[in-house]
Regions:
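Extracellular/periplasmic periplasmic-binding protein-like sensory domains
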Residues: 45-119, 129-135
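Generic hydrophobic alpha-helical scaffold/packing signal
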Residues: 30, 42, 46, 58, ...
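Residues within well-ordered alpha-helical secondary structure of globular protein domains
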Residues: 16-19, 99-102, 146
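Catalytic-loop motifs flanking and including active-site residues across diverse enzymes
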Residues: 34-37, 92, 117-121, 167
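Segments of small-molecule ligand-sensing domains
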Residues: 102-115, 124-173
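Extracellular/periplasmic Venus flytrap/periplasmic-binding protein
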Residues: 1-48, 87-95, 157
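Short, amphipathic alpha-helical "lid/cap" segments that border enzyme active or binding sites
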Residues: 10-14, 115-122, 126
Length: 173
C-alpha cells in the first residue's frame, strides 16, 4: 500500500497486514513512510498488538527524532536502516551532540541523519574550497569529487561524481 505524505489513519492498512499474516504466511513490512506519519503508524501497530517477532518492520526513513516522546516499548525488535543514529557512541558524535545541545540550549533535542549529512557536506565543501583555492562554483564543484570526511558514527563519507555521498548504512533497533 502507498499513501500520501502526512497520512495518519493507519488502522485499515495495519488491519490488512495483520489479516494477511494470520493466514500463516511469513510476513514483514518494508516501510518507506516519511516524517511525522511514522508516529501514527507505529502507534497503530501497538494498538493492534503487533510485535516484531510476529510481523517485523524494517523502515528506511525513521530516526530517533520521529520517535522522540513515543512509548517505544511496543516497538522493540523492529528495525530501521539509516546513515546516522544519535545513540552511536563515538568521540566525534559525542562532541557533535554536545555542541548541538549548547547551541539549541535544550538537552532533550535529538540530532538526526539530515543534520549529519549537512555537517559532512559543509565540511567537504570547506575542504574543496581550500583545495580549489577559491570559492568559484565551477572550481569548487570539481574539487568536491572524491572529497572524504569522517562520519560522526564511524567510517568515512565520500563525495561521488554524481553529487551523492557514499556513507555506511546502519541498522538500528
Amino acid at each position: 500500500n502507498y499513501t500520501p505524505f502526512g497520512h495518519s489513519d493507519w488502522q485499515t492498512i495495519v488491519s490488512k497486514v495483520k489479516k494477511f499474516a494470520s493466514s500463516g504466511k511469513k510476513t514483514a513490512v518494508v516501510s518507506t513512510i516519511n516524517g511525522d506519519a511514522n508516529i501514527p503508524f507505529y502507534k497503530e501497530l501497538g494498538n493492534q498488538g503487533i510485535k516484531a517477532e510476529d510481523i517485523p518492520v524494517v523502515a528506511f526513513s525513521v530516526g530517533e527524532e520521529e520517535l522522540a516522546g513515543l512509548d517505544t516499548k511496543p516497538l522493540v525488535g523492529h528495525l530501521t536502516a539509516w546513515n546516522y543514529f544519535m545513540s552511536i557512541e563515538t568521540p566525534e558524535n559525542t562532541a557533535f551532540i554536545k555542541k548541538w545541545h549548547a547551541f539549541i540550549k535544550n538537552k532533550k533535542r535529538v540530532t538526526n541523519d539530515p543534520m549529519e549529512a549537512h555537517y559532512i557536506g559543509f565540511n567537504m565543501w570547506a575542504q574543496a574550497v581550500k583545495q580549489a583555492g577559491t570559492t568559484n562554483v565551477d572550481a569548487v564543484r570539481q574539487a568536491m569529487y572524491g572529497q572524504k570526511f569522517k562520519n560522526l558514527t564511524g567510517g568515512v563519507a565520500v563525495m561521488n561524481t554524481n553529487h551523492h555521498l557514499s556513507k555506511p548504512v546502519l541498522i538500528g533497533e
